[in-house]
Regions:
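Two-component/phosphorelay signaling modules centered on CheY-like receiver
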Residues: 10-33
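Conserved RecA-like P-loop NTPase ATPase core
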Residues: 17, 88, 146
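Short acidic capping loops at alpha-helix termini that bridge into adjacent secondary structure
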Residues: 28, 75-77, 145
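CheY-like receiver
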Residues: 36-124
Length: 159
């Protein structure tokens, strides 16, 4: 199942989403009530999905997404939560995977999760080549030709 964090300044809304995510068997790694600690956490941890309020007080959704792109260890899917339906279009303009209207309904949450899981499955199925840097140039090697990988310190060897 996917892993997630919640970034929501409203404590009750965060708690409601936490309960729903647990019911959907999502591995909840952390809950943040401010954007800055979440961004710091994302710079050193990996997560599949970030559920974030589109209207956080310290930074708006656009700034939050831009900072994630600059600082996150791995780019997660973003699902914005909002109390206003008119913010839905804005969520997609911000390259969100989906949006959820508050109060969040279980069926709508499950639909969003199913879409993200399917999208990630398609990405995994489309993997065809390793991209390997070989003396200043990149070489693509079909994954079927790789016999094994060996990691040593900060280097990975492909055989």
């Amino acid at each position: 199942m996917p892993s997630a964090i919640i970034v929501e300044d409203e404590v009750l809304a965060a708690e409601r989403l936490r309960v729903l995510l647990e019911e959907c068997n999502v591995v909840l790694l952390n809950v943040f009530h401010h954007a800055m600690p979440a961004l710091e956490w994302l710079s050193v941890h990996e997560v599949d999905i970030v559920f974030a309020d589109i209207g956080m007080p310290e930074i708006d959704g656009l700034e939050f997404v831009e900072r994630i792109k600059r600082t996150a260890k791995r780019q997660p899917e973003i699902v914005f939560t909002t109390a206003y339906e008119e913010h839905a279009l804005r969520a997609f303009e911000l390259a969100a995977a989906d949006y959820l209207l508050k109060p969040i309904k279980m069926t709508r949450l499950q639909t969003a999760l199913d879409r993200i899981i399917e999208k990630n499955r398609e990405k995994a199925d489309s993997f065809t080549h390793f991209k390997v840097y070989n003396r200043e140039r990149m070489v693509e090697i079909p994954w079927q030709q790789a016999r094994y990988l060996m990691a040593e310190h900060k280097t990975v060897y492909l055989f």
